[in-house]
C-alpha cells in the first residue's frame, strides 16, 4: 500500500505546475541630476517592462515628489531637484503598491480600471486585487 501511495503522490507532483517564478527581474531606475531638474532617461523602458502606462507612472511620481514633470519619448523630466535615493524610494513604493502581486509576489501583473477603481490582475496566479487610488 505504501508503494502505491508513493507512486500516486509522485504522479500528482508531476501533474501539478511548478511554483511560479518571476519572469523578469525588476529593472533598475537611472536618475540624473541637473540644475533644477531630475531626469530619468529609462522611464519608458521601465514602464514597458513592468506592463504599466507611462502616464500613470509619471502621475504617481509627480504626486509623491510634489513636483511637475514632462515625458518626452522614453525620458521623464521632473522639474525640481530630487536626490537619486528619494527617487529610488518612490520607485520602490510604486513597485510595491502597483506592480507586485500581494498573493504570489509575482511582477507579472496588469493594471485595469473597473469603473472608478484600479484593479491589479496577476497573470501568474489569477488573483485580482484593488489598488490604492492615485
Curated annotation (Swiss-Prot):
Domain of life: Archaea
Keywords: Initiation factor, Protein biosynthesis
Keyword match Acetylation: no
MF GO annotations: translation initiation factor activity
Family: Belongs to the eIF-2-beta/eIF-5 family.
HAMAP family cross-referenced by the UniProt entry: eIF_2_beta
Role noted for this protein: eIF-2 functions in the early steps of protein synthesis by forming a ternary complex with GTP and initiator tRNA.
Quaternary structure note: Heterotrimer composed of an alpha, a beta and a gamma chain.
The name this protein goes by in its record: Translation initiation factor 2 subunit beta
Gene responsible for this protein: eif2b
